[in-house]
Amino acid sequence: MTVFSLVASHHDLDLDTVARLSAGATGVGPALPGSGAAGAVVLATCNRVEIYAEADGAGVEAARAGLLSAVAASTSLPDEDVHAAFRTLDADATARHLFEVGVGLDSAVVGEREIAGQVRRALTAAQEAGTASGPLVRLFESATRTAKDVGSHTALGAAGRSVVSVALDLAEELRGLTDAAAQRDFWAGATILLIGTGAYAGTTLAQLADRGATTVGVHSASGRAEQFVADRGGWALALGGEAVAGAVAEADVIIGSSGGERQISPERLQELREGGRRPLTVVDLALSRDFDPAVADLPDVDLITLESVRLAAPEQAQVAVAEARALVDDAVEEYRAAQRGRSADAAIKALRRHTLGVLDRELERVRARHGCTAAAEEVEFALRRMVNQLLHEPSVRAKRLAAEGRLDRYEDALEAVFGIEAPGRPASEVGTVEAACPAHEDEGGAARIA
């Protein structure tokens, strides 16, 4: 089995296309059984949709086709367009890519902190849906550990830059607020409406609080506003549907984070504003857009989108980026070594099976001649303990050689010395050698045959 990934992101596609692919990726889980893949985890953020999957080595292309056909079936995009939108990464490239994504090196805002949580939640969602295979779990857990290491040992992201912070910085710039005092005065006096409780809503509310905002209304079409506000200190105001029109009319800033199917049109926004000329800043953080881009043409309305954020994102210090990349390099090599070590399982099991076969045949002869006498049981106990001890060092060496990329030497030795051909399939967990008869502990705590 091998791990691979299908990647579509802001590097290659416009965000509208990414949004449509992201919506289609919800079809991956239900389609998994017939896709040819043994497992899948979908990572969808504001600027990427990526499918991490596991399949038999010879079946990767078939699994790729099956997964992307599931995406296409859940979108209005032609099948061939969906297939062309995704790049395919092999196992080694997949690990490096996910680790770089998880630490924020591949983000529109380099070093952003939200992405690590999104990687973690993607794995959790796949585990709850039953689509995360063991190798995918290990891959994502390694990526999460790497993100923590980068956060602890480098200055990447130390400035707290994120999609939300850059968007709010842009809002300040558009209003000509150049000094800290003016910026804080603006947020303290501004009336703000947050629409939706989507991916960036929690971070947005926290950022607004940090900047001194005091008047924030939150509306959720799905009715989650009250719980959302309560979970975050209760300082904002949850708004029902009947209060939204008035909130829009009074707002200085409206922030969209719902990702719903319907967009607010220029006509509807103008109607809700009651034709007023009060300056309004609209920040659209929804990947699928909460606002029609044409609202930017309305008088006294400034529109900030995810594309605006991408273009305005500041560059991280080169030293911090270099340090983060070095940690990613180390983490990728550690992950690869661990995977190579696991590749020794089949050879270890083959040696154990061969050795136990010899032992069991000899024990059958002993039992046939002497039955379960005390002497025979003592012999069996001693031989099984000896076999466990003899197999320990070869098993350790197999893992070590595999981690060093030299497993072929071990397999050649097995074939040359014992005539064992290691099976080319994943091995189940290999335990200790068990006795054929019940066992109990003697007075010194050692197991003995009953």
Swiss-Prot record:
The record marks H97 as: Important for activity. The keyword Secreted does not apply. It comes from the Bacteria. NADP(+) binds at G196, T197, G198, A199, Y200, A201. Substrate binds at T45, C46, N47, R48, S107, E112, R113, E114, Q118. Pathway: Porphyrin-containing compound metabolism; protoporphyrin-IX biosynthesis; 5-aminolevulinate from L-glutamyl-tRNA(Glu): step 1/2. InterPro entries: 4pyrrol_synth_GluRdtase, 4pyrrol_synth_GluRdtase_dimer, 4pyrrol_synth_GluRdtase_N, GluRdtase_dimer_dom_sf, GluRdtase_N_sf, NAD(P)-bd_dom_sf, Shikm_DH/Glu-tRNA_Rdtase. Pfam families: GlutR_dimer, GlutR_N, Shikimate_DH. One of its GO terms (molecular function) is NADP binding. Its EC number is 1.2.1.70. Possesses an unusual extended V-shaped dimeric structure with each monomer consisting of three distinct domains arranged along a curved 'spinal' alpha-helix. The N-terminal catalytic domain specifically recognizes the glutamate moiety of the substrate. The second domain is the NADPH-binding domain, and the third C-terminal domain is responsible for dimerization. Catalyzes the NADPH-dependent reduction of glutamyl-tRNA(Glu) to glutamate 1-semialdehyde (GSA). Belongs to the glutamyl-tRNA reductase family. Homodimer. This is Glutamyl-tRNA reductase. It comes from Micrococcus luteus (strain ATCC 4698 / DSM 20030 / JCM 1464 / CCM 169 / CCUG 5858 / IAM 1056 / NBRC 3333 / NCIMB 9278 / NCTC 2665 / VKM Ac-2230) (Micrococcus lysodeikticus).
